[in-house]
Amino acid sequence: MEAAAGGRGGFQPHPGLQKTLEQFHLSSMSSLGGPAAFSARWAQEAYKKESAKEAGAAAVPAPVPAAAEPPPVLHLPAIQPPPPVLPGPFFMPSDRSTERCETVLEGETISCFVVGGEKRLCLPQILNSVLRDFSLQQINSVCDELHTYCSRCTADQLEILKVMGILPFSAPSCGLITKTDAERLCNALLYGGAYPPPCKKELAASLALGLELSERSVRVYHECFGKCKGLLVPELYSSPSAACIQCLDCRLMYPPHKFVVHSHKALENRTCHWGFDSANWRAYILLSQDYTGKEEQTRLGRCLDDVKEKFDYGNKYKRRVPRVSSEPPASIRKTDDTPSQHPTSSEKDKQSGWLRTLASPSSKSLGCVHPRQRLSAFRPWSPAVSTSDKELPPHLPALIRDSFYSYKSFETGVAPNVALAPPAQQKVVSSPPCATVVSRAPEPLATCVQPRKRKLAVDTPGAPETPVPVAAPEDDKDSEAEVEVESREEFTSSLSSLSSPSFTSSSSAKDLSSPGVHVPPVAPAAADAAAPADTPSSGLEAELEHLRQALEGGLDTKEAKEKFLHEVVKMRVKQEEKLSAALQAKRSLHQELEFLRVAKKEKLREATEAKRNLRKEIERLRAENEKKMKEANESRLRLKRELEQARQVRVCDKGCEAGRLRAKYSAQIEDLQVKLQHAEADREQLRADLLREREAREHLEKVVKELQEQLWPRPRSEATGGESTAELEP
């Protein structure tokens, strides 16, 4: 038995299996890709090599004395210490920011959201403005080459884009692309990084040779999306968008903000890029490592700083502090000279000192140090450097809040190997069959309440306080429900599902407690078992203590038994009264909950109707605005055509125009002269007519006078004859 126990205690797994399990564990804890990212083939090959070495060593004949053979000794593999227990993953709530901002991409203003510190641009707006000359097939092929991932916007972000008029109201979803991937995509499509035609290569080569030989050029490089070297000509940097950097590969000139995106080497398509912005080119362009002289480095570094300070209106670029010593620390050289040795305690101190040296401002101007120490504002993360030169602290805090256990608090794309910490253990309370069931079977996380609330519900088993943790999630769901028909139906179903267990528990408690009244007092243990567990813990403990004392004291006499039965009946009546009060309170709370549910449903319906009306009004206003914009565009085009015609008329030759005007004026003068002649003729004719009329009038007057002379003399003679007779009569 002892041998068996000793053999069982000293058992160790297979060395290859142990290494595989260790690497499997480390890969699963340090990678979001999970254990699938680890291949155990190299571990098996290493084990085969070790076993082959051991077999070769065993094959060498050893001198054995002929006197007696020693007993065979079983050599077990060396016991390796277990790997250190790594801390759990560091969980943080996902950033679901809905604050809209704007950014400039290739001269176009694009709407975006800042999510997790990275700008995520509206992809349809980019396709309709910056990349409008490219087909979707071309864009998709470039996205596949660059391994670009586009996420989907949330419902709130989609609603904001619709309200701002960026997307139509009929858009079901919208893609978001990071600013870094947008810069890469636009650069690959618009500029492409292609070489110039062969006919211009000699000219470009001669120009590049001239720039290299010139003392006014500075060799620079960047490490964004693959390293690229170039020649900076400070004199050509006359404007923020001036082409002043020549690529040494394609011999083309680029502005600084385009040069940091330009590359001909490995495009780092399988690298996770974050936080790139071409406007920060001052942090990406570095002085070339080819300059070895201290004075030359200082002079050219000052020249590069002067270029970076030009047109820096935001004063974002600050000059680097000059280094104190020109040589790197001794710890740096020692660390770089012996990278393969296992670090001892002193070497670990030196490594930490090297890290502090890199972090200090004095090392920021090192020009010709080890490539691992070069300062780069945009360098891909290297796992080899981090594992060999940096050490993780032994215990990292794994901050996981209770409120983050719900699946809605994390990103939907969490790797399956990331194990969430289990929620707080619920207290198991042994309750009689008639007790209200508080903790049910496990349900999906979407319908569970938070662990703290469940724990409070279990710790306080009183019936009046039971519906309180059930009603709290109702208010939370009401406040978070969207004003849509689907969310309204989900809200109603969740209310019904949460309210149905309370009905079941109350009815079951009522059915189980009502027949308990008729239980004869002969069975006190059964009556005690049928007592509800919804009473306060203090009263129940006091009654149990009273029963225990009575049972321990003994029931020898009849009076003691009757007194004991009387106490049991009294406790039973008291428990029934408490249970009925609890059921009544629960029923009233449920009625109030039903009333609130109906009221909330009515308010939700009104809000839905108001939102529908508002959406119709917005759609009508949008249609009117589109109509007005169409009319304005048509009027603008018409005015533009008229302006073009007037401009073409004015463009004619001035001499031709003067001759045409002279001919025009002479024709007008001739017409006026003809009209004047006609007017003179008409005037002469009118004068002749007037003379004829005057002669006719004079002739008529003469005729009238003759007629008057012929008529008037006779009456005058008669008058003279009458007067003479009158004079004779008297």
UniProtKB/Swiss-Prot annotation:
Phosphoserine found at: 382, 431, 479
Compositional bias of kind Basic and acidic residues: 333-351
Domain of life: Eukaryota
Ranges of biased composition (kind: Acidic residues): 473-484
Matches recorded under Pfam families: c-SKI_SMAD_bind, Ski_Sno_DHD
An annotated GO cellular component: nucleus
Subcellular locations according to the entry: Nucleus
UniProt KW keywords: Coiled coil, Nucleus, Phosphoprotein, Proto-oncogene, Repeat, Ubl conjugation
InterPro entries: c-SKI_SMAD4-bd_dom, DHD_Ski, DNA-bd_dom_put_sf, SAND-like_dom_sf, SKI/SNO/DAC, Ski_DNA-bd_sf, Tscrpt_reg_SKI_SnoN
GO molecular function: DNA-binding transcription factor activity, RNA polymerase II-specific; DNA-binding transcription repressor activity, RNA polymerase II-specific; protein kinase binding; RNA polymerase II cis-regulatory region sequence-specific DNA binding; SMAD binding; ubiquitin protein ligase binding; zinc ion binding
Composition bias, Low complexity: 460-472, 492-508, 524-534
Stretches the record annotates as Disordered: 321-356, 452-538, 708-730
Post-translational modification remark: Ubiquitinated by ARK2C, promoting proteasomal degradation, leading to enhance the BMP-Smad signaling.
SMART domains (UniProt xref): c-SKI_SMAD_bind
Quaternary structure, from the entry: Interacts with SMAD2, SMAD3 and SMAD4. Interacts with HIPK2. Part of a complex with HIPK2 and SMAD1/2/3. Interacts with PRDM16 and SMAD3; the interaction with PRDM16 promotes the recruitment SMAD3-HDAC1 complex on the promoter of TGF-beta target genes.
Function: May play a role in terminal differentiation of skeletal muscle cells but not in the determination of cells to the myogenic lineage. Functions as a repressor of TGF-beta signaling.
Similarity comment: family membership: Belongs to the SKI family.
The name this protein goes by in its record: Ski oncogene
Species the sequence originates in: Equus caballus (Horse)
